[in-house]
Amino acid sequence: MEQFDDARPRLEKQYEQVQYDPASGLSPEALRQEFDAECARHPGEPRILTRARLMRLICEKARIAPEKDNFFASKVDGGGLFLQLRRQWGQEMWKKEFDFQPDGWCSMTDLKEHACHYCVDTSHTCPDWEALLTLGFPGLKRRAEQGGDTPFHRAAAMVCEGAAILCERLGRASDNPALEALAHRPPQTLHEAFQIALLYHDLQEMEGEEVRTMGWFDRLYLNFYRNDIAAGRLTRESAKELIKYFWIAFYAKWQGKRFGKNFCFGPEINELSMLALETYYELNTVDPKLSLLLTPETPQAFLELVARNIRDGRTAIVSLNYPLVVEGLIRHGRTPEDARRCIPVGCYEPAVFGREISCSGATHFFLPQAVALFLEEKGEYATFEELKQACFHRIAREIAYMEEQQRRCESIWPEINPAPLLSSTLADCIRKGRDITEGGAEYNSTACVVSYLPEAVDSLAAIEYLVYQEKLCTLDELRAALAADWKGFETLQLFARNRAPKWGNNDPAADRLAVELTRFVAPLINEAPNRRGGRFFASLYGQMVVERGRLIGALPDGRNAGTPVAKNLDACISMDRNGITALMESVVKLDLANFPCGTCLDLMLHPSAVQGDDGITAIAALIRTFLAEGGSGLQFNIFDVETLRDAQRHPENYRNLQVRVCGWNVRFTDLPPEAQQTFIDQAGAIAG
């Protein structure tokens, strides 16, 4: 096989330049005709069987792409039929349940009136990779057949049978013995294990559920690696080549312009952990991204290798506090044994591996918008304490509304996107005879991302300071300033921005409000039932800061309408005035185990602060200190403001400049100017 460095330009474009063999199967048009005929032969059957028939039809008869110059083959031309079917059913069910058609899958219409967002979340899933690697497609088919004869069991067996047939077809077309073997048995080598994982990934995403974690890399593949080394099939260097061929496929699919493909490492660190982090450094790409489950016992050598990646611009890495993650999961209903088998799904949202469907992007609650809605009520309050309690009451009311709307979403999920392939990997689904959309997993959670805490805290702190402490304005005057987007109230805005307490500075007044607000909100979410026999599941971070900021009006903290909001648990943009230690001190005052679906802090460092070996040691020490003090998740950006400004002016010179955007990385030059400016402003603030 061609050396990776020579093949890389071609491999990076492999999903853009797919060459399907016309003679290998049916065109999308012919496939559609055959599917329509198949549906006509089975009128009125459960929709999960309809989707299973479509998967098997595609696997058996769709065109495929021979890939003789790649270690891995997985490309089959499904013709967009799954997406068409999901849209058809989605439009029907949304109209039936809600009497409106949403923009895509999600309803954003309630953000302004109810400070929330809800959706049918098919984008945050984790299959049981252990079952796939242990049983293979034939074994999963047998397990489904032995589990029962319900429509669900038949559908699960059908899709696994189709996947095995596709292995045979792709293997023959690509001269790939690994694929041909996988048609009949589970993987036995590292090459075969990577191959079945990639093919499964592509099939599940075609089915309609985004794979948001590829599992524990250094646990799932360790024995395959060790056996190949012992048998002489691989050397350390040839294993690196194989990993690069595998990982670059995930970059190639979206070109680094989506949310990143997550591979997890830890908490136990081994020789494959070290090899993979070395390979990641050499690969130097925005995707895949790495999630690290760290403990006080994490070896220093591993942590310094992580720090070297971060210091040198490979920042698509989040460090997670494994003991705290486990504590949060146990506190909120998982058994200790299950909690210890956690996996970050998506950005940094823990779930129980192989037993939980967490839907970690299902709902969002926008705290500062709720504060703004409360102010619009035009109530009068003699004390700040009275105002705060009334504001909390409005927040509770809107959270209850959001939860009820989400339960309605989940009631139609089985009729929109039943998931026989994903469900076939989960033993609990097979045991119960139920798809994931109907509560087939052991833990059926619905996450709520509690977003933009910094703006909410700073807004409440500003109200207390401006109205009740310094008496610089009345509530009605503050409302008038917000309605005018601070025009004509510029002096008051300066007091709000520069004198009122700010989150992220270890300020007791602001941090007290953050503790009170999070302590109030968490049980409203974590104790609420969902529609699938589980509960809601709180996380605490903020993403899409430019896009969501456009939808949020002026706020009491001095923020203008439509401007970007804070990422994750960071201070509001340019408001972290006391350095990173103060920022971390603010964060660790919160009881983050009450947000078991994940939280994260972003740190931006100037390159001069992390130069040389001492810089690597400093980053490693920051990670250890933050996690030891009770932080949950930590990630970094390291650059100076002049580099970013020059990249804006001369993007052709900075094609490999990565930035960490909430829970994933992108190339800086791929960001729109407004998003670029948020990084420039933050970098300018730390430069002084």
Short names for language-model regions:
Residues 162-165, 169:
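Extended, non-transmembrane alpha-helical coiled-coils
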